[in-house]
Design a protein with these regions (language model features):
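Bacterial N-terminal signal peptides
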Residues: 9-17
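Bacterial N-terminal signal peptides that target proteins for export
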Residues: 1-8
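A beta-rich soluble binding module of mature secreted/lumenal proteins
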Residues: 19-180
Length: 180
């Protein structure tokens, strides 16, 4: 019968080997050179995304950012669940700027102590459209200040997302219904 010490050593060796086996590293994401946080604040409508499991079936999705006095960013994700007139849902989180030289890399905290990777990969000069990405290339959001975007502009941003290493066949258009 193996001793506790040998079992612990074997487990430690397997854990070390698992950590040492890293898949091919992805190249760094392109980031917005500088994000003016005051201009970035406000409402952003999600036009298309490679969604998280929590975003399946959303309509009228919108992120709202508010810069707080302590430098954190209060974030509210609002949407209608499962239908254009479905129940309104809200998720709140707190953003933390992790790269103050550019303000383009944030940690987004939905549950303490975990911070999700959140990178402003692109923001237009007029702060009208943005692309939010993640280093893992698992999720991405194309957002705009208004709930609509031309097909040509969406195609340009989709090409940008593809150039960042994303599988754009997973990109889904988010239904935005303007309700008077």
């Amino acid at each position: 019968m193996p001793s506790r010490k040998s079992l612990l050593s074997a487990c430690l060796a397997m854990l070390t080997a698992a950590c040492a086996t890293v898949p091919d590293a992805l190249p760094p994401l392109e980031l917005a050179p500088h994000v003016d946080l005051h201009r970035f604040m406000g409402d952003w409508y999600v036009i298309a995304s490679i969604p998280t499991i929590f975003e399946d079936g959303v309509h009228n999705a919108k992120d709202t950012y508010e810069l707080m006095p302590d430098g954190t960013i209060a974030t509210t994700f609002t949407f209608n669940a499962d239908a254009p007139d479905g129940p309104i849902k809200h998720y709140k989180s707190v953003g933390f700027v992790l790269a103050p030289d550019s303000n383009a890399v944030w940690g987004q905290q939905y549950l303490w102590p975990f911070k999700a990777d959140y990178r402003i990969s692109y923001v237009s000069p007029d702060y009208d459209v943005t692309v939010i990405a993640r280093a893992k290339r698992d999720h991405v959001w194309i957002m705009a200040r208004s709930p609509s975007m031309s097909d040509a502009q969406l195609a340009r941003l989709t090409a940008f997302v593809a150039a960042q290493g994303y599988d754009t066949t997973k990109l889904k258009r988010v239904p935005q219904h303007v309700i008077p």
